[in-house]
Amino acid sequence: QPTELAKISFILTFAMHLNNVRTRLNEPKELGKLLLHLAVPILIIHVQGDDGTAIIYAIIGCCMMFAAGLSWKYILGAVSVAAVAMATAFAFFSDKIGKGYQWYRILAVIDPDNKTGWAPSETIWKNIIYQQQRGEIALGSGGIFGNGLFGGSYYSVPNAHNDFILSWIGNAAGFVGCCVVLGVLFALVIKTFLTGARSEDLLGTFICAGIGGALLAQIAVNVGMNLRVLPVIGVTLPFYSAGGSSVLMLYICVGLVLSVYTHNTKKLFG
């Protein structure tokens, strides 16, 4: 997956860009250049059909610009424009954009029983909801302590080793196992952000903000997919889901954070 390995390049180049314009970040001209820097990889990935990764890139960029001191007026303005655009799309253009599996996956979260008839056929409806439905059953059947490592019905979940690894963990180790797994991941995210906050070099701060944002976004989206509160968009659970390029990218990110921590940190208090 080239887009996974490209995350490193994007985080590093965007961090250097922010570091070069940090005193002029809120000037419209410089902000426009930053948004162009962010938009190019997002559009390329979107054209390839990987909207899940495109969303992660957008969150990475937002976290890094926030860490660099982006004005709240731009943040609130962007949120408002996005909300209005989404509401307008749903209200007036749903008949034009409401085609294809990506759109059906969104509608499957809103109306999983197809009461509004969004699916053109029963076969498409069953194919769309099957993965999340089986994942939810596997996750819920684990109870508090799970069914054991080789017990339960998790084998019936498509891609249980990848996007739905959390359903496998919930089935095998239960609610307690999921809490342990997510607790370790969130501890890593917090440590990454704290390392960035302690960095005496703003470049290190921006790098840690991007890496922390990427981890947090992937965790949140993957958990949402497994709980059927977000559509399936192909976002893996960091360090647990299968995938060579994804795991390689994650370990490189950890190495960058450790480099910032080792060479250029200060005490937060005192």
Where do the language-model regions lie?
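Short hydrophobic "helix-edge" motifs at membrane interfaces and signal-peptide entry regions
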Residues: A39-P41, E136, P231-V232
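Short gly/pro-enriched beta-turn/loop segments at secondary-structure junctions
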Residues: Y101, Y130-R134
